[in-house]
Amino acid sequence: MAQLLRSFINQSCESLAEKEKSVKHGSIVHTKICGTREFGKDCRSSRIIRCNARSHFSRNAGEFNLSGRKLTNMLQSSILFFLLAVPPEKPFAITVVDDRTNRGVPMIELRTVHGIRLFTDSNGIVAFREPGLMSETVFFHVSGHGYEHAKDGFGFRGKQLKIEPGAAATIKVTRINIAERLYRVTGGGIYRDSLLVGTKVPLAEPALNGQVIGSDSVMNAVYRGKIYWFWGDTNRPGYPLGNYNVPGATSELPEKGGLSPELGVNYSYFVDEKGFARKTCEMPGKGPTWVETLVTLKDKDGRERLLAEFVKVEAPLKIYARGLAVFNDEKQQFEKLFDLDVSAPCVPRGHAVRHKDADGDYVYFAHPYPLTRVPATAEAFGDPSQYECYTCLKAGTKLENQSIDRDAEGKIRYSWKKNTPAVGPPEQAKLIAAGKMKAAESPINLRDRDSDKAVTAHGGSVYWNEFRKRWVMIAVEHYGKSSLLGEVWYAEAESLVGPWRQAVKIVTHEKYSFYNPKQNPMFDREGGRFIYLEGTYTNTFSGNPDATPRYDYNQMMYRLDLSDPRLVIPKK
């Protein structure tokens, strides 16, 4: 098309030049600029142009002159405008789907032979539009965390596609992960390529919401009929420094008008006057504010309150202040209740889960093991003296004392104690190294079900699952095989405090982090058969300098089918 128009411009210019030379002074000519570009016909009823001695055309009633050269320029400009107004070639739509579910797979990389890299959006779509290749056959290498394409005869994992503007093709990949990657939850361009090819998308704001292009670890809770979401450090497009004081948002519950969790989450961000997700928990002191616990509890008057534990952080990731806060519904931000002693042995940290048993009604805080609890009232949450830790230390002692609580027969005793620190994996490792206890004596002795290799759980959550009739833990491994903080595990126990014995790997990210994973129990489907979990996908701590465009430093949602036979953990 472009070449044809350029040829036409050149021919028109040459014709105009010749006609201008042939027009005699004082003659009447008709210039008809139309599809046939007829020139020089006498016509009294049409537009009349008279040639003067200087070979200028002047309209009978006009007040300005146009030379043949100027008319040529006008014609060139008009056609150039038309050329520029022609829409660009439509992109070629490539959809990468899971070969078992036929659902589009996000974050699959397509790489050409000469290194053009493209990543599927949350519909599994890439909009390919590359000048020079729009009518060629192109080979794409196909790769993505937890998924793979079959090898061809030469060992290449990829596929040849005949590119045609506006056409489409599908590439199938096999899922290696047990968990299924669904979509990116935060950031910009979640459905970028879908928009470019005209595919329907589920989100109200599929390209940019709250000016958020990156968000760290999530905390959420159901409060007054909605889901409240809060994140750590958050990036914006306008400047490298973003929001370091807890941006937040709300969304509707799926059963109350919200999206089905298999489709996405429509966030309504709390925004500032510029439209950027604003601070909701800015506490005094230098450095960022992070929320480490979020829970909904009723006070003595029966009023539901949204409560949080926060920390202040300075380099290098040192917590120098800690406190409790309550959400102000009118201001839509947290207000400090009071400070906590940074060195206090029992503080709420981690994702909250409520449980009532013979001991009473408590809120437990899992990080990832639920080793701290407090009575399930707003007043108790705000009283540091009410917190208890699950520990094998003697009451009132510190870890450095290494005083193990044992019965008369020397058997180690774990129990809930006040003013005594919990013994989680890091503390347990120190006691084992000091010869004070053995790993088998602890309720926390998590190992790979298949290899019996020890699994060090770093961050995660624990919730009751009605489908499995057990407590289910989702946790990321510290010092995993493929990445420092990128391998996610599934474990279950009959008791909230364990014993936690066997785990199954459900997600792998090759040399990439996926830290602070969290199950979202409000999204459970089919009685808990399907659970939904998300985490922070980032190259931070991974040693990998290659950050995935748009996806890096954002939350990614996965779905896990608990009826999958690969998840069976024998009861012991």
Language-model region placement:
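Short, ordered, surface-exposed loop/turn motifs in non-cytosolic proteins
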Residues: 90-92, 100-114
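Beta-rich carbohydrate-recognition and catalytic domains
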Residues: 166, 173-213, 222-287, 296-346, ...
